[in-house]
Amino acid sequence: MFGAFIIGDELLVGKREDKHLGFLIGALAKRGLRLAWAHYLGDEPARLTEALKRSFASSEVVFSFGGIGATPDDHTRQCVAAALQVPLVLHPDAEREIRTRFAGQEVTPQRLQMGEFPRGAAIIPNPVNRIPGFSVGEHHFVPGFPQMAWPMVESVLDTRYRERFGSGKWAEASVLVFEAGESQLIPAMQAVERSFAGIKVFSLPSMGADGSRIHVELGVRGDPAQVGAAMERLRREVGAAGFPHK
């Protein structure tokens, strides 16, 4: 199972629009994988630390975007260390990358702070400016800049999780139902979910500008081997209930 943390006050106050969620969904889908959940978090250390504690207690693969720099509003590195109850230490590989990045310039303590990761972490190379991200177990922490974060995430997927590619394949099919409210379609939906363990049923109502109901998109998604039969069963249930559909 794959999850995501997307971190930064700038997202929650509307100063920046998130692009990471759409990217991650697409990057996983290209590899036959699916995103199970995503959480947006501000730059609030206590809340972030608690969220990380819960996440580290699971066996899920988690990508975290943002907050790994060295400015006062960057808390992710510190919160990961707090959640794991380990110190931040200057990672030798990160130090080497930082010194290479700033060759010929003063390598200040502030610059080296960007390479201080929770003890036991591994670095994620940054192909853009060489300031790395880091991994702790199945959790992977990358910068908030898409041009840096995205190739780093794809590299992690391709080097760490190739054996899982295709494990999250799914399919979807739907039908438009007219002259019915969602509540009237519940029996049909329940009948399908009872009969097909690998299938989820969904309903998406559409409204006109005046609030009048136009139709309900009713569908199934899940195991590709079951979608066809589940959709046929759903059509039969809707037809038996007397609702027009196409």
What residue ranges belong to the model's regions?
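Structural motif
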Residues: 3, 60-61, 115, 122, ...
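Generic secondary-structure signature for well-ordered alpha-helical cores
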Residues: 29, 33-34, 43, 57, ...
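Proline/glycine-rich low-complexity loops and linkers
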Residues: 47-50, 74-164
